[in-house]
Amino acid sequence: MAVSRKDWSALSSLARQRTLEDEEEQERERRRRHRNLSSTTDDEAPRLSQNGDRQASASERLPSVEEAEVPKPLPPASKDEDEDIQSILRTRQERRQRRQVVEAAQAPIQERLEAEEGRNSLSPVQATQKPLVSKKELEIPPRRRLSREQRGPWALEEESLVGREPEERKKGVPEKSPVLEKSSMPKKTAPEKSLVSDKTSISEKVLASEKTSLSEKIAVSEKRNSSEKKSVLEKTSVSEKSLAPGMALGSGRRLVSEKASIFEKALASEKSPTADAKPAPKRATASEQPLAQEPPASGGSPATTKEQRGRALPGKNLPSLAKQGASDPPTVASRLPPVTLQVKIPSKEEEADMSSPTQRTYSSSLKRSSPRTISFRMKPKKENSETTLTRSASMKLPDNTVKLGEKLERYHTAIRRSESVKSRGLPCTELFVAPVGVASKRHLFEKELAGQSRAEPASSRKENLRLSGVVTSRLNLWISRTQESGDQDPQEAQKASSATERTQWGQKSDSSLDAEV
């Protein structure tokens, strides 16, 4: 049972630490809100009274925490559980340290912006004193989380820090504010590492109740500040319109009022777009001019300016604020130049229609037509097809077809000649088809005719040399075939036909040479 109680105590301490972290984040947001509100206000007396109340409440609150924590130290948990919880707490502590480093880096920048914005309304001492007091009052409860016995070596450092803080608050020196914040951040992280031993439920409940009371007091003070600022804004709205645009606060409030009127008129103009199409962008350009006249000091932090606008608006009704919040994205679109250009484009087109001399000659139907048809009729030089077609590939097709036709004709003639040679050789084979008995006995009585047939073609060739090449070739073919058909064997006939073909090609070459000479 003891182990289970220790586990439950460890889990409960983790849950409490999570709630404390959430409360710390909420307190940081409240500090930022206080800074933004302090930059816009003109009153100093309520702040001083609120600071006095908070200091008194902090001084009353601190001893009660120590009294609740000191007399009830619990026995420590087992070593394994302590190590597990410490590993979890270390990771969370590293995250806190990172957040605090970021805040420490951003704090002097925000204070500079506040000092620049509040020069007209506040003295720099009070402007820097306000965030200092609020920060350190809100950071006191986590430092007092542990008893002196459990804290050990950090107790002396914390007591010295607490002793220094009220003295520095009384001094209110603005130059030491970033240094104090940076020095208090790392020293705050050291005692939080020993949160494992903080398992007293009574002390945590006291802390939670104190923090709730502190948050309630802060909320009350914020409501007072907002109500006082609303009254100041309503009183000074008339006087600020007459001021020069060099003041950043006056120009920001003027922009809020102008944009509210512009968007209310823009909603009405959307219902009747034909009547109010041109005046709306002119109002948008009028709102652009005070934007350009704003000094760069006001544009240093866009988040703060947006929050100031959001807090300056609650002087009006809540539904109107919701409408303006819904119409915030169109503000960016209305500032852009394309809105004015869309109004000017139709006027330029009408002037061009009136000034162009070519469209005066056309009828009303041609004026209504698209610009492509007008440009096509106005440029007749492009209709000359001779120059364009000579360069195109379509005009070169007839030349290519003629050349191809000649080549095809030559090819067909060569094919015909080869076919004619083959067809002339066919009847010889048909004539020599004979029965086997006749072919075997033919050599007995045809030996004498074979010698005569061999001698006769030579004499006929010599006689035909005098004629033209084509005629001699054909004559030699016919003579040789008629002589060989009745006398020679099929093998001898084939030899004779090959010899005649050779002589034919030789005679053709000789005749071509004679014709050239």
Curated annotation (Swiss-Prot):
The modification Omega-N-methylarginine is found at residue 424. The keyword Metal-binding does not apply. Residues 48-58, 120-131, 355-373, 494-517 have a biased composition (Polar residues). Keywords: Basement membrane, Extracellular matrix, Methylation, Phosphoprotein, Repeat, Secreted. It is found in: Secreted, Extracellular space, Extracellular matrix, Basement membrane. One of its GO terms (molecular function) is structural molecule activity. One of its GO terms (cellular component) is basement membrane. SEK repeats lie at residues 203-205, 209-211, 215-217, 221-223, 227-229, 239-241, 257-259, 269-271. PANTHER family: LADININ 1, LADININ-1. This is Ladinin-1. It comes from Homo sapiens. The gene is LAD1.
